[in-house]
């Protein structure tokens, strides 16, 4: 699925200063390698971006993965006019090898928030490739698997709230039990939960529990029939095409404020034999066991 724009790719490195993490641990500086996909200006052969300000999506990959696995999905968003910044989590990305640890997941919401800060700083600069590119009032976050746990904490846990975020897509994620705050003690921003019903890694109860715990009016659950943990987000297949269309319509609705995009969500999310989209707490989405 391709949008109107051709896309560019630029790799950046941000250094998150030393700070106290949400559990009170002292954290040293964290290096955040970041791949930024962005819409290119029409009529130019170089790397010049389309005219801003544009909406921003910050994306968190799953444990021991990097954004390359999700390239088609991220490119779909960028080709539709979004700047998409995908972080390499410093202690759990594909680059960490045997040193990767899920214990650092509690610190990853801070990495996502620092990505937002860093991208906005580049946009505020007077010069540079991304100067003036990003609209600070149009920011979404998304993540898959452990990256989904990460963005779910920003949206719904008292530990990690970031009020700059307008919408959150949790792709086969869960409530990470070691987060220091409380989940869903307040109404979060609009959230979309996507889940394969044949997923044995992040089992359906993990996403269903969040959908049911969320009390916001704008909440959605995309049920993918027979999909496993990664197929809906990697490469191009019938599941990935549904996820690409529904997530894009979700961002268009709640980041850009385009009301007709909700109809597009329902049209693209209800595909006989492939997917069903439920909303506002409705649908046969049963809470269940979640093992993380």
Could you say what each language-model-derived stretch is?
Residues 69, 101-136, 153:
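Alpha/beta-hydrolase active-site loop
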Residues 226, 235-292:
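Alpha/beta-hydrolase-fold serine-hydrolase catalytic core, especially in secreted/extracellular enzymes
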Residues 1-58, 83:
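Short conserved active-site loop signatures built around small residues
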Residues 128, 138-140, 167-169:
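Residue in the alpha/beta-hydrolase core beta-strand immediately N-terminal to the catalytic nucleophile
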Residues 143-147, 151:
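Gly/Ala-rich beta-loop-alpha elbow adjacent to hydrolase catalytic centers
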Residues 43-97, 178, 200-203:
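Short substrate-entry loop that stabilizes the transition state in hydrolases
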Residues 163-229:
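The feature captures the conserved acid-bearing segment of alpha/beta-hydrolase catalytic domains
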Residues 154-165:
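Conserved hydrolase catalytic core segment
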């Amino acid at each position: 699925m391709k949008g109107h724009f051709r896309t560019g790719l630029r790799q950046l490195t941000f250094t998150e200063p030393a700070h106290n993490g949400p559990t009170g641990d002292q954290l040293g500086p964290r290096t955040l390698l970041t791949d930024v996909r962005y819409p290119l200006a029409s009529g130019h052969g170089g790397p010049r971006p389309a005219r801003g300000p544009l909406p921003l999506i910050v994306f968190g990959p799953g444990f021991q993965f990097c954004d390359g696995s999700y390239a088609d999905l991220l490119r779909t968003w960028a080709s539709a006019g979004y700047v998409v910044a995908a972080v390499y989590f410093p202690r759990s990305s594909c680059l960490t090898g045997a040193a990767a640890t899920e214990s650092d997941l509690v610190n990853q919401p801070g990495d996502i928030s620092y990505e937002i800060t860093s991208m906005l700083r580049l946009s505020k600069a007077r010069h540079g490739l991304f100067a003036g590119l990003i609209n600070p009032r149009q920011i979404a976050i998304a993540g898959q698997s452990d990256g989904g746990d990460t963005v779910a904490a920003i949206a719904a846990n008292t530990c990690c709230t970031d009020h700059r975020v307008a919408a959150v897509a949790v792709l086969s994620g869960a409530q990470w039990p070691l987060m220091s705050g409380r989940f869903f003690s307040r109404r979060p921003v609009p959230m979309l939960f996507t889940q394969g019903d044949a997923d044995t890694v992040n089992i359906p109860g993990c996403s269903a529990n969040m959908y049911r715990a969320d009390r916001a009016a704008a909440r959605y659950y995309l049920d993918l029939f027979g999909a496993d943990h990664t197929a809906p987000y990697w490469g191009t297949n019938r599941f990935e095409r549904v996820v690409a269309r529904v997530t894009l319509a979700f961002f268009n609705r709640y980041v850009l404020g385009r009301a007709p995009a909700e109809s597009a969500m329902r049209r693209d999310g209800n595909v006989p034999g492939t997917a069903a989209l439920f909303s506002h707490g409705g649908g046969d989405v049963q809470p269940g066991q979640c093992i993380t």
